[in-house]
Amino acid sequence: MTKSEQLFERAVKHLPGGVNSPVRAFLSVGGSPRFIESADGAYIYDVDGNKYIDYINSWGPMILGHNHEVIRTAVIEAAQKGLSYGAATEAEVEMAELLCEIVPCFEMVRMVNSGTEAVMSAIRAARGYTKRNKIIKFEGCYHGHSDGLLVKAGSGVMVAGIPDSMGVPSNCVKDTLQAKYNNLDSVIELFKQNKDEIAAIIVEPVAANMGVVLPEEGFLEGLRELCTKHGALLIFDEVITGFRLSLSGAQGYYNIIPDLATFGKIIGGGMPVGCYGGRREIMEMVAPVGPVYQAGTLSGNPVAMAAGMAQLKYLKEHPEVYTKINELGEYFRNKVNELFDKYNIKYQVSGVGSLACIFFADSRVTDYETAKLADTKEFARYFRFMLEHGIYIAPAQFEAMFFSNAHTYQDIEDTLLVIEQYLKIQ
């Protein structure tokens, strides 16, 4: 029995499923999860001494690679002053100024501790501002685990084989309306059926929790126009795309400005953090200046702020990072497609910039229904093969691969070699 297996055996006795987040349990791919001991650059190391090229990157935030010196130094310096004060700090002011400078839709911002918290709070602010209750979300888009949004969600909910979650009362989701991603007609119909009742549309501008499904031409523009026409707010969930597609996120990349946006993961440089923000008149609805209550004891934690600022400042000062990681992503996707052609395989590779996903599906994936056609059993076999050969990808068909500044073309070539070995035995 490996040390990882021993740890998992201990973990299941005291942690539900042996993990603190369901997808880590490897239920959809089989086998025991690897317990990670350390990480550096593009690589992670498990407790049994195995080295992997890492394409999870802590689910996105390690855009510079693991254990980056600039971030590590900032964390150490901040921690030496104190871990948490429960009071206002200069660091959170500087972070807010930096975010409002970089993010196109931000005039004001509120720090929180996770992406889920950011989304919950943004929706509450939207409802308070518009004095409406109904929200439109898209099938297959994942916005965290808050009650009102666990309806046909993506991410781990899709691979768990459950459409929603027990413990969520029907009243919690009665104001959550479902539209089809990349289908403006479904959105138009909801506005017709719920005239003057819709507070906001929330969307992953790139549906990265559904397998990196890209917006069709005109889709995001159409959402912007519909929200403006009907007096609803447009919320971009940029927990995955933020500061990854570009320094200004998906809203900068696609030049579509939402009214509110949510971020997580990456703005903490690897520390637990999130934020939501947008137009001043909306954000001034938030307490203590407005009637929309939202609070957090550890929000704006000084160590997290230091880590986040270090990463964002580095990205701002080094635009070549985006050139490199986007080229790596494009190179990988092109080479995988060449392998599919070589072996006459009809699988799909999707992605944009430094995001990628290999779909074990015969036809192009554009929405929730086509994503569900993917062969998850085939993905499980592929995942185990990759893991056994030193490539660490997300243990779920519908998650993204993340390329970092620490990855090299040699890492990509080594990964492509393993993929080709897998295709040869099919």
Swiss-Prot record:
Membrane-spanning segments: none
PROSITE patterns: AA_TRANSFER_CLASS_3
Cofactor requirement: pyridoxal 5'-phosphate
Catalytic reactions of this protein: (S)-4-amino-5-oxopentanoate = 5-aminolevulinate
A cellular-component GO term for this protein: cytoplasm
Annotated Gene3D superfamilies: Aspartate Aminotransferase, domain 1, Type I PLP-dependent aspartate aminotransferase-like (Major domain)
Pathway info: Porphyrin-containing compound metabolism; protoporphyrin-IX biosynthesis; 5-aminolevulinate from L-glutamyl-tRNA(Glu): step 2/2
Main subcellular location of this protein, as a coarse class: cytoplasm
Keyword Oxidoreductase tagged: no
Subunit relationships: Homodimer.
PANTHER family cross-referenced by the UniProt entry: GLUTAMATE-1-SEMIALDEHYDE 2,1-AMINOMUTASE (PTHR43713), GLUTAMATE-1-SEMIALDEHYDE 2,1-AMINOMUTASE 1, CHLOROPLASTIC-RELATED (PTHR43713:SF3)
NCBIfam families: hemL, PRK00062.1
Protein name: Glutamate-1-semialdehyde 2,1-aminomutase 2
Species of provenance: Lachnoclostridium phytofermentans (strain ATCC 700394 / DSM 18823 / ISDg)
Annotated gene: hemL2
